[in-house]
């Protein structure tokens, strides 16, 4: 099916989602499985950047990810340490892979990383022991460091560094209108969290322990401007606070400056790790 045909079939299946079971066959199953396969192979994305800089969300692709849970029963998933297993409805991305598939994929997966089927990992990515959820897209040259998590349908750009313990939020629970997006050449500091469909624009740097959701105030220190849900391109952001009332200060994220050469020298990627 073409993408237009898939979209039509997925939208129809969504309206009848309560009737979909592991016994469902025909066009509905084909459309769901083909959409998940396209997401897995990177030929389809849940969100795509337009020439204007805006992100277009393919809501139907996100619906297909959810519908996939209706098509399968729980089953044993192999591959755990010491011959152990998991109990889930979603296969590992590489459950059936051999040398040829790994060679063609072109990314590096360190022991104990987990990627679920329908997530795309581009060539040149390095996955330390980390977790990438279904429907996500991780672009080339990116490092997903130890204990970092990439949530369902999240979009991670090229040459991004997600430091240890970083959390990038998903869209499936609670349901979000759009995915969390980290654009190209961003550095996300250790233990930071970006969630609820927020966007970190190209070339930005988040310091350690920065938390950004849709209700988080993002304050530009130079101008005093307050924004929500989006970090402007080339920003350096740290954790801060603003006075509230009764002598209480509340958390905010503070844009302290724009990225300069000194910042780049501290946050540039190491090509030796990506050979």
Curated annotation (Swiss-Prot):
Disulfide bonds: none
Protein's cellular compartments: Cytoplasm
Residues engaged in binding substrate: 108, 145
EC nos: 2.3.1.117
Highest rank taxon of the organism: Bacteria
Gene Ontology annotations for the cellular component aspect, listed alphabetically: cytoplasm
Keyword set, alphabetical order: Acyltransferase, Amino-acid biosynthesis, Cytoplasm, Diaminopimelate biosynthesis, Lysine biosynthesis, Repeat, Transferase
Catalytic reactions of this protein: (S)-2,3,4,5-tetrahydrodipicolinate + succinyl-CoA + H2O = (S)-2-succinylamino-6-oxoheptanedioate + CoA
Subunit structure, interactors included: Homotrimer.
Family classification: Belongs to the transferase hexapeptide repeat family.
Protein name, entry field: 2,3,4,5-tetrahydropyridine-2,6-dicarboxylate N-succinyltransferase
Organism of provenance: Jannaschia sp. (strain CCS1)
């Amino acid at each position: 099916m073409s993408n237009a045909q898939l979209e039509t079939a997925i939208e129809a299946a969504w309206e009848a989602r309560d009737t979909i079971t592991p016994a469902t066959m025909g066009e509905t199953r084909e459309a769901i499985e083909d959409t998940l396969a396209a997401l897995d192979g990177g030929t389809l994305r849940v969100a795509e950047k337009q020439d204007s800089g805006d992100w277009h969300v393919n809501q139907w692709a996100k619906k297909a990810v959810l519908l996939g849970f209706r098509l399968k029963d729980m089953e044993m998933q192999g591959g755990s340490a010491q011959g152990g297993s998991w109990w889930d409805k979603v296969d590992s991305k590489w459950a059936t892979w051999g040398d040829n598939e790994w060679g063609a994929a072109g990314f590096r997966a360190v022991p104990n990383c987990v990627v679920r089927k329908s997530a795309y990992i581009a060539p040149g990515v390095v996955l330390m022991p980390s977790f990438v959820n279904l429907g996500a897209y991780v672009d080339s040259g990116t490092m997903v460091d130890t204990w970092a998590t990439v949530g369902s349908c999240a979009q991670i750009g090229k040459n991004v560094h997600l430091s240890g313990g970083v959390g990038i939020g998903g869209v499936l629970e609670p349901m979000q209108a759009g995915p969390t997006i980290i654009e190209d050449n961003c550095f996300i500091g250790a233990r930071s969290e970006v969630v609820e469909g927020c966007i970190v624009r190209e070339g930005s740097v988040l310091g350690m322990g920065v938390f950004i959701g849709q209700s988080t105030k993002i304050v530009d220190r130079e101008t005093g401007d307050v924004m929500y849900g989006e970090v402007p391109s080339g920003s350096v952001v740290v954790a801060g606070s603003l006075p509230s009332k009764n002598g209480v200060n509340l958390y905010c994220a503070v844009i302290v400056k724009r990225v300069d050469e000194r910042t780049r020298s501290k946050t540039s990627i190491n090509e030796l790790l990506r050979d």
